[in-house]
Swiss-Prot record:
It catalyses: sn-glycerol 3-phosphate + NAD(+) = dihydroxyacetone phosphate + NADH + H(+); sn-glycerol 3-phosphate + NADP(+) = dihydroxyacetone phosphate + NADPH + H(+). It comes from Synechocystis sp. (strain ATCC 27184 / PCC 6803 / Kazusa). It is found in: Cytoplasm. The lineage of its organism: Bacteria, Bacillati, Cyanobacteriota, Cyanophyceae, Synechococcales. This is Glycerol-3-phosphate dehydrogenase [NAD(P)+]. GO terms for molecular function: glycerol-3-phosphate dehydrogenase [NAD(P)+] activity; NAD binding. The gene is gpsA.
Length: 317
């Protein structure tokens, strides 16, 4: 079925009523797409709400993905129901991405990843933005592109869901580092250098697991990295900024008003990097900082005093 040519619009259910889930529902409703939002506090059950849905958009936190996926796995979903994951994070138990969790739970369903430089508050204000829908099922990607595209929300497609997902997930770690840099008042030169060196670190991880290099130069990679590392609207950026001002991690998280997925992602990424022997120098300093092993100035010093090397060493695309 093509949503664009159908007599009636598709029925969509957004899982997760946080800032991001609410923003995605806002875009869909503005496009006259019938959309319901489910959360753990919803009076209606998850099962009854998604029964008959054409599209399910998951915007629950990474912590909630496995349990929600297990509940949908037990259902008999329509074969062409498309599952779109918009969660950014890594599961601490399995060290897998949200789309990998969903694919394991729903092997017969088309799975798509939605990610890009999309700060939810700007989306809610109707400011222009662009995003990426990635899937190995091109038809599914194009269907999701159709329902989300709007005058102020441009949607691209690609066929690299893993790279799209990793770009959106790993930049949260880098945003913590950039928040530290900004909070310490290290200047534009330092901030630019840090963001630039963050991109090959993200790409290195992605390529190790088979992602496509071009993905990281696009909206889900460089685009999301720039947005998240340039705005106090980013919760991960604010974590780093708060640490640079002497606040404890516990204090920062308590006052954040939402989840900073970069904190959990840092821990999981270090485990993956250790297991796979992937160089992640920025992530290692963020990890040490989050666990109180070094101070913010010491983290900067450790990065600046690394062994000298060629710019594109161990970054062979």
């Amino acid at each position: 079925m093509s949503f664009a040519n159908a007599d009636t619009p598709p029925q969509v259910v957004v899982l997760g009523a946080g800032a991001w889930g609410s923003s995605l529902a806002y875009v869909l409703n503005n496009n006259d797409i019938p959309t319901q939002v489910w959360s753990r506090r919803s009076p209606q059950s998850l099962e009854s709400m998604v029964a008959g849905a054409d599209v399910i958009v998951s915007a629950v936190s990474i912590k909630g993905v496995p349990s929600v996926a297990a509940r949908l796995e037990a259902m008999d979903l329509q074969r062409r129901t498309i599952l779109v994951t918009a969660t950014k994070g890594l599961d601490p138990e399995t060290m897998t991405t949200p789309s990998q969790i969903w694919q394991a739970a729903l092997p017969s369903q088309p799975i798509a990843v939605l990610s890009g430089p999309n700060l939810s508050k700007e989306i809610d204000q109707g400011l222009p933005a662009a995003t990426v829908v990635a899937s190995s099922d091109q038809a599914a990607a194009e269907e999701i592109q159709t329902i989300f595209a709007a005058d102020n929300f441009r949607v691209y497609t690609n066929n690299d869901p893993l790279g799209t997902e990793l770009g959106g997930t790993l930049k949260n770690v880098m945003a913590i580092a950039v928040g530290v840099c900004e909070g310490l008042g290290l200047g534009t030169n330092a901030k630019s250098a840090l963001i630039t060196r963050a991109l090959p670190e993200i790409t290195r991880v992605g390529l190790h697991f088979g992602a496509q290099p071009d993905t990281f130069w696009g909206l889900a990679g460089l685009g999301d990295l720039l947005a998240t590392c340039s705005s106090m609207l980013s919760r991960n950026y604010r974590v780093g900024y708060g640490l640079s001002k002497g606040q404890s991690l516990e204090e920062i998280l308590a006052n954040l008003g939402g989840t900073a997925e970069g904190v959990n992602t840092t821990d999981v990424l270090i485990k993956i990097a250790n297991r796979e022997k992937i160089a992640v120098p920025i992530t290692r300093q963020v990890y040490r900082l989050l666990h109180g092993k070094i101070t913010p100035p010491q983290a900067v010093e450790a990065l600046m005093e690394r062994e000298l090397k060629a710019e594109f060493e161990d970054f062979d695309l």
